A protein has these predicted regions:
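Loop/turn elements at helix/coil->beta-strand transitions in domains of secreted/extracellular proteins
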Residues: 33-34, 56-58, 81-84, 164-168, ...
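A ligand-binding cleft/hinge motif common to bilobed small-molecule-binding domains
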Residues: 93-95, 230-247
Length: 352
């Protein structure tokens, strides 16, 4: 879930016609034609698309987005069949299922599904993985440039310290930043009580003076360059920044972090269902997952790939957040329209 900044309200449920056969012809691997993939920016290596095309003969047409809401809006604004595959996060999947926007997956075509760690299967947002399979996940952690920050940071709450004025890069993601504020106060990231949200807003706005930059696309850049000394950014971005600047460290907040999992899904009305299934199954191959993790080192749910990567991945806590960190965290959930309106107003006030 890489970038999720634009707050939109849940649209009314839309009816989409079922794709005839619902994958009934997908039992054999497709080997020609094309597939239209709509994914996060800086999240799937070009080399993976190239290798898939070479191996299968299927041309991959790639479009990108910077937030779940951006993706949802674009899919709804385009004609049905414009995109075959999307890569939504946990909470967005729940919404898209409710709006009948996703095609059921042909499990017989997913011969590589057994490579996924059982811990990441059968999620609450898609019981039985009827519509989705995991790609990558991670947490919103704290990046600290120890050469510029003298004090120890251990929590989301520490980010509100006035001494950090003008030093923060934070995700351009309303659910992440508001959720982080809620967690720092002992509340849920999915808080709906207007009275509690008023308390959260009051604290949220005190963060404004500390924020130098909102960036979800490449927040590591500000950390690597030294323009920002502290960040509330995705764990993989911290891992990449640590490779460039040895003074940068990762801190997992003691309150428990924002946790996410992004998942492959096929849109209703897909014109290339068989090719889409072939692509998703390819992404579940261990070698493919290794290539992905080498370039974008997020939490890898592919157990076979993790075994191949060895200690460089498994013992790097920025690339591979410890199990206890994940267990202490919280996933974002869908919220009702009235609550989303409050969140939107809070976000607008923070950024104005």
């Amino acid at each position: 879930m890489k970038k999720r900044w634009l707050c939109m309200f849940m649209a009314s449920a839309v009816a989409a016609s079922m794709l005839t056969g619902c994958g009934g012809s997908s039992k054999s691997e497709a080997t020609n034609g094309e597939v239209n993939v709509f994914v996060w920016t800086e999240y799937v290596p070009e080399s993976v698309f190239d290798a898939f095309e070479e191996e299968t003969g299927i041309k991959v047409n790639v479009s990108t987005y910077s937030s779940n809401e951006d993706m949802l809006s674009k899919v709804k604004s385009e004609s049905e069949g414009t995109y075959d595959i999307v890569l939504p996060s946990d909470y967005m999947i729940e919404l898209m299922i409710a709006q009948d926007m996703l095609e059921e997956l042909d499990k017989e075509a997913l011969t590589n599904l057994s490579n996924i760690n059982d811990v990441y299967l059968d999620p609450s947002y898609d019981p039985g993985n009827v519509y989705t399979v995991p790609y990558q996940g991670g947490v919103a952690a704290i990046a600290v440039n120890t050469s510029k920050v003298d004090k120890e940071l251990t929590s989301y709450d520490d980010l509100f310290d006035p001494d950090l004025a003008g030093q923060l890069v934070v995700l351009d993601d309303y659910r992440a930043v508001i959720g982080m504020t809620a967690r720092s106060m002992g509340y849920s990231m999915n808080e709906t009580d207007p009275a509690v949200l008023s308390e959260i807003e009051e604290k949220l706005l005190t963060l404004k003076n500390n924020i130098a930059l909102f960036d979800s696309d490449s927040p590591k850049s500000a950390m690597i360059s030294g323009d920002c000394s502290v960040g509330m950014i995705w764990s993989a971005e911290i891992a990449l920044s640590m490779e460039e600047n040895p003074d940068i460290e990762v801190v997992y907040p003691e309150e428990g972090p924002y946790v996410f999992m992004d998942n492959w899904a096929i849109l209703k009305g897909s014109k290339n269902y068989d090719n889409a299934m072939t692509f998703i199954n390819y992404m579940l191959e261990p070698d493919t997952a290794v290539k992905v993790s080498e370039e974008f080192p997020y939490l890898c749910p592919n157990k076979a790939a993790v075994e191949q990567m060895g200690t460089d991945y498994s013992e790097n806590i920025a690339k591979n957040p410890p199990a206890e960190v994940i267990a202490s965290g919280e996933y974002v959930e869908n919220l009702d329209n009235d609550t989303l309106e409050i969140y939107n107003e809070m976000w607008t006030k923070l950024k104005e």
